[in-house]
Amino acid sequence: MPNDLYAIYNRYTSRTLFFKYCATATLTHRLTRRLSLFTLKKCLARPQGRLFSLVNSIYFGGETLEEVQSTATFLARSGIACVLDYAVEGENDETQFDKAMENTLRLIEMSQQTDSLPFVVIKPSSLGSVAVYARQSERLALDEASASAWSRIVTRFSRLFDYARSHGVHVMVDAEQTAIQPAVDRLVLDMMREFNRDSAVITLTLQFYLKDQLRFLDECYQRACQDNFLFGVKVVRGAYLEEEKRVNGGVRCFATKQETDRSYNAAVDYIALRLDRIAPFFATHNEESLALIMSSESLRAGRTWVGQLYGLGDHITYSLLQTGFRVCKYLPYGPLDKSLPYLLRRIEENAVASATFKKENKLLQKELLRRLVGGM
């Protein structure tokens, strides 16, 4: 753990740091978590005011490409790379899908020119209709309009991957809800055969709160061996648990956090032995998982990527810088009013009482005291 608290928290004003401390304390305490989430959602529902600005300054990189590039440049001074993520959700027409693609093409160009931006992110639902993905996931027949829409989705993915390969940039495909994820998985794996021959241009996200993900990870590895490509994988616990519970009772998900943790850690062990065909990116704030990753000589030698969300687990990120792993912050940006669903889901996903956030709160408290005594 780095002793230089200034290096970890120097991007925050004292007011913002105090808010972050209070938010972390209340969101991770079992007695105040639900009320805190409710209050945040109510306040953020109206994109204005002091609270909205504070949350934005902690968790968001900016509204425009220029703003997010400035944030990325600041992090790069400390040796931290960034994964840029256009956080707008809920668009549902072809014009907006094309706009999202064009925006990602610009991101790829920016990434090529900036060493600290090794990945760009695409969210499948920003490139096509959720309804069309759902029908494809269930292998249902498509009518003429849906077939045309699916063809455009495939074209958008292909264009982005081809552009990324020609520019030497990696593309990370975000996970979606289970209702549409099978179509995404099949499409992306098919395209890995073409684009991941020499390097992992494409990285697919697997969510290990799902009961079938270890089996699917093995299937992906076997296919990579058979078809001679690199399987790029981002390993996460998952961001849609509450929604999965609402939609299908959560039957596809593990019932407890402990089971999810075991699943995630089993994936770490599996991947560490198969770096001949797997190029991993581990996204986690979990102390146990991080210890497992850092203890693996093969993962360290393989120049594995490890990442945390912007505004969360800053002490973890700075600790990892000392270990030889390549370190990223997942940096969302976009118009604030359209990015709220993303922001709220990320806050809720990480509002858990854990050793990680208890430790973070102690460090925040220590830094606030240091500033108070030092007159900062």
From Swiss-Prot:
Claim: Translocase is one of the keywords in the record: no
Pathway(s) served: Antibiotic biosynthesis; carbapenem biosynthesis
Transmembrane segments: none
An annotated GO BP: proline catabolic process to glutamate
Gene3D superfamilies from the UniProt entry: 3.20.20.220
Record's keyword terms, sorted: Antibiotic biosynthesis, Oxidoreductase
A single MF term (Gene Ontology): FAD binding
A matching Pfam family: Pro_dh
Family indicated by similarity: Belongs to the proline oxidase family.
Protein name per Swiss-Prot or TrEMBL: Carbapenem antibiotics biosynthesis protein CarD
